[in-house]
Amino acid sequence: MKTFSLLRILIVLVGMAGAFATPAMALVEININKGNVEPMPIAIPDFLSANGIGAKISAVVEADLKRSGLFAPVNHGAFIDKQINPDQAPNMQNWTVLNAQALVVGRITQEGDGRLRAEFRLWDTYAGQQMSGQQFYTQPENWRRVAHIIADAIYERITGEKGYFDTRIVFVAESGTKTDRKRQLAIMDQDGENVRMLTNTANLVLTPRFSPNRQEVTYMSFEGNQPRVYLLQLETGQREVVGNFPGMTFSPRFSPDGQRVIMSLQQDANSNIYTMDLRSRTTTRLTSTAAIDTSPSYAPDGRRIVFESDRGGRQQLYVMNSDGSGQTRISFGEGSYSTPVWSPRGDLIAFTKQSGGKFSIGVMKPDGSGERLLTTGFHNEGPTWAPNGRVLMFFRQAAGSGGPQLYSIDLTGYNEQLVKTPSFASDPAWSPLLE
């Protein structure tokens, strides 16, 4: 199999203090805990540069913030000042007249060693004060990642929450006809750019999941008509089978510390949940029922596990302790529940719900209370959390369409976005923030 090497990136963060330093008081902000909020008008003129790279970087920053649903970029055609020197204080009246509450200015220069230096400043236009100023150094080929890091810094400064733009998605890329569909493992940036294939075989692949350190992916593949769980090293492209069990293995996922893989093993007509220690390769059985127990997901502290089971007749969600004790049903609504995944914040569990011939993506609290459906359609499935626990990605196949596509939606349920990919796509999994 052809190997792929992840781009190594060295980014140096330097605070930009000085004449425009920000006082400790809070300036313009967005409270994302209030539910659906009015997007904040923000102006992002093209970053200064000698070769056009500045405009490319600022465009990605703008696209990231707009897609979050929390920011409304001001139309560039209305700008009085088309570009701004970040070393000079902006004329705030030229921005407040456009109702821009925040202003981002920046500059991209190339150092003598070939690296790019990217610097930006974030301004509160009505207070006339700088809120943030940072600069980064990186290789030219990593310019998109610098843009995502800048967008994360702006998002965090204004909302008080960590951003999620400097992340990747691993997913199943689908091509071909419905009767001759090829499914390959692929990886991309969270905005759908920089897509790369990780596998290139005719074997079916399903349910890829990132490790907490972002360097490994576990997934299921049918090889020799036998489904197995594999561990893929993203740096080297090397892979190995996670255990050699007599029956089917599926729905793999890492523990929060990355030391174990939890999965479902089929025995006769039943399937139960097991964990495997990746160092010793020893397995521990957590459930023992005459039912189908599958799709396990750890709480972020590793103490509890949510999973789906049809032990009550229909697929429902259950929570248990990490040793398998205390198995308790938490879903009681009409229909069936599947593909649960615990939020990185620990406060919610996302799931797929099938009811009335439709599929919904929803969330509930770990005790089963507060169920909310965020989106409903012909076929929605497989939610995955952004690392800040504020956004979900899932896949949807519309009625009559040729194949599935990826979508993102925030916890308000209002900001739903298509994530464009070169081919049909399913089974997304969101990485932690990159470093």
From Swiss-Prot:
InterPro entries: 6-blade_b-propeller_TolB-like, PD40, Tol-Pal_TolB, TolB_N
Keyword Signal: yes
Top-rank taxon, per record: Bacteria
GO-annotated biological processes: cell division; protein import
Principal localisation: periplasm
Signal peptide as annotated in the record: 1-26
Keywords for this protein: Cell cycle, Cell division, Periplasm, Signal
Listed Gene3D superfamilies: TolB, C-terminal domain, TolB, N-terminal domain
GO cellular component: periplasmic space
Subcellular location: Periplasm
Family: Belongs to the TolB family.
HAMAP family associated with the record: TolB (MF_00671)
Summary of the function given for this chain in its UniProt record: Part of the Tol-Pal system, which plays a role in outer membrane invagination during cell division and is important for maintaining outer membrane integrity.
Subunit structure of this chain's protein: The Tol-Pal system is composed of five core proteins: the inner membrane proteins TolA, TolQ and TolR, the periplasmic protein TolB and the outer membrane protein Pal. They form a network linking the inner and outer membranes and the peptidoglycan layer.
Protein name stated in the entry: Tol-Pal system protein TolB
Gene that specifies this protein: tolB
